[in-house]
């Protein structure tokens, strides 16, 4: 379990993380979302003792990282896959980590097999592609078989098969009762992987909840309907007090259900060619909830 209590980090006059409090529970995959500059990496660095909080605390099973007697056996992390000695082989990089943390050498070959890079074990780490470097970083995180795992953008550089593999791995690790805390900018992938979300903006907590609750809270489903009598149907729906958006071939009806729209159409003998519920996606909910917290915004034109 990871607990953040009023976690705050200032860099000069800039507040990167602002009184952040939440709990990352074991047994589920918790996604960590926020716009660029929101404070995600800084938060992870404070959890791992790489940055000191200005105030507040970040603890792993009740202890700060610096209080852990066997850190690699307590928490594993992937923050930057390129942080390796470029001239060491893949296997020797992991053997060095194992030796300095009193981890049996046999564990090195186990994690190499687990992440699918046994075939490049003798290759210099500095020559690996980004995708292979990510796999090596994940292997390093798993080396101590820790109960708590943090991954910062673990699917960067991975092909579709690799992304699917990471998704399966995260869910397997959580299913074993571990705490899995993972950040990603690929929201479609996060919606397939995460059980819970921690969402921040400008260093402040926006939400700490399940994926389903977050999506439901940040946007209601709409109903899409097509009919050969579109104008008449629109008038019926508006007269019923519903909010309706019109496109050339369909209507989008807000804050209602397919049952309600279907009953109104039937009552007025209006044929329907399509009647479907359009669920809010995680991406739509995320953009809605973080719109005011975006630090870096590009121009559309």
Where are these regions (language model features)?
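Short, flexible turn/loop "capping" segments at secondary-structure junctions
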Residues: 49, 72, 214-217, 245-246, ...
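Short linear loop/turn motifs
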Residues: 126, 249-253, 279
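Conserved NTP-handling cores and scaffolds of large molecular machines
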Residues: 101, 218, 241, 279, ...
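C-terminal coupling/interaction segments
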Residues: 256-301
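ABC transporter nucleotide-binding domain
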Residues: 166-252
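ABC transporter nucleotide-binding domains
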Residues: 2-4, 9-182, 187-201
């Amino acid at each position: 379990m990871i607990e953040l209590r009023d976690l705050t980090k200032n860099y000069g006059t800039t507040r990167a993380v602002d009184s952040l409090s939440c709990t990352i529970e074991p047994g589920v995959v918790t996604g960590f979302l926020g716009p660029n500059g929101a404070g995600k990496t800084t938060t992870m660095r404070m959890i791992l003792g790489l940055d000191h909080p200005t105030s507040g605390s970040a603890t792993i099973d009740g202890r700060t990282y610096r209080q852990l007697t066997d850190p690699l056996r307590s928490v594993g992390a992937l923050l930057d896959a390129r942080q390796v000695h470029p001239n060491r082989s893949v296997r020797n990089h992991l053997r060095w980590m194992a030796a300095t943390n009193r981890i049996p050498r046999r564990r090195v070959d186990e994690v190499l097999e687990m992440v699918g890079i046994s075939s490049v074990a003798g290759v210099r780490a500095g020559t690996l592609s980004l995708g292979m470097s990510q796999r090596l970083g994940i292997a390093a995180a798993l080396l101590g078989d820790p109960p708590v795992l943090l991954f910062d953008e673990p699917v960067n550089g991975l092909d579709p098969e690799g992304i699917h593999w990471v998704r399966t791995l995260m869910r397997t690790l959580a299913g074993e009762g571990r705490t899995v805390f993972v950040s990603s900018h690929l929201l479609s992938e996060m919606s397939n992987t995460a059980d819970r979300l921690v969402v921040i903006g400008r260093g402040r907590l926006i939400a700490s909840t399940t994926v389903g609750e977050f999506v439901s809270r940040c946007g209601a489903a709409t109903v899409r309907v097509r009919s050969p009598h579109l104008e008449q149907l629109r008038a019926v729906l508006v007269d019923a007090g519903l909010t309706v958006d019109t496109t050339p071939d369909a209507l989008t009806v807000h804050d209602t259900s397919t049952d309600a729209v279907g009953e109104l159409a039937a009552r007025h003998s209006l044929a329907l060619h399509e009647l479907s519920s359009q669920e809010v996606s995680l991406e739509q909910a995320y953009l809605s909830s973080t719109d005011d917290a975006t630090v870096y915004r590009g121009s559309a034109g």
